[in-house]
Design a protein with these regions (language model features):
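Solvent-exposed loop and capping/linker segments of extracellular ligand-binding repeat ectodomains
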Residues: 1-163
Length: 163
């Protein structure tokens, strides 16, 4: 069961926090809100009922007006893949440690291009890296995330596809 491209490229301005509360069997969100150019924020509890969801790919990619994401968006979920989650969200200003506020997200193995092009995102990339100890695919995760406090200290293979 998946929400694939459900609201992609629509005029969605606001997302109700309980939007997916009646769908606990969902296992994947892909391009669900991709390209929603008027969306400015994502509520913290949006996925709280998605207890079986493992895949979150391109969910908010190209949401160019997105500025804020609620605390612990993917907390307590069995997420394994968060590739391209916020790809191209150039206005996203939320601290990466606010979005991922637990000490560990051990189920996550793919963070490829998660924050690619999020030039306004704040916080510390190295801290996020420490929270996802089992990641095996992470190229471009922080590509052009120049507002991170430690952007210049990040390993090259988290910024591009080079070691």
């Amino acid at each position: 069961t998946a929400f694939g491209a459900t609201f992609q490229n629509t005029g969605v301005v606001e997302i109700p926090e309980n939007l997916f509360s009646g769908n606990p069997l969902v296992t994947a969100y892909g391009q669900t809100f991709r390209g929603c150019k008027n969306l400015r924020s994502v509520p913290a509890g949006l996925f709280v009922a998605s207890i079986n969801a493992t895949t979150f790919t391109n969910v908010f990619a190209e949401c160019v007006a997105l500025e804020e994401v609620g605390v612990g968006l993917l907390n307590n979920l069995p997420a394994t893949t968060i590739g391209y989650l916020f790809d191209g969200c150039v206005q996203l200003r939320t601290n990466v440690s606010t979005i991922f506020n637990l000490s560990s997200y051990s189920t996550i193995v793919t963070t490829t291009a998660t924050f690619r092009g999020c030039s306004a995102i704040t916080g510390k990339g190295l801290e996020f890296m420490g929270k996802v100890p089992n990641v095996t695919a992470h190229y471009y995760a922080f590509y052009n995330c120049t507002s991170l406090d430690d952007f210049t200290d990040l390993p090259g293979n988290w910024i591009t596809n080079k070691l």
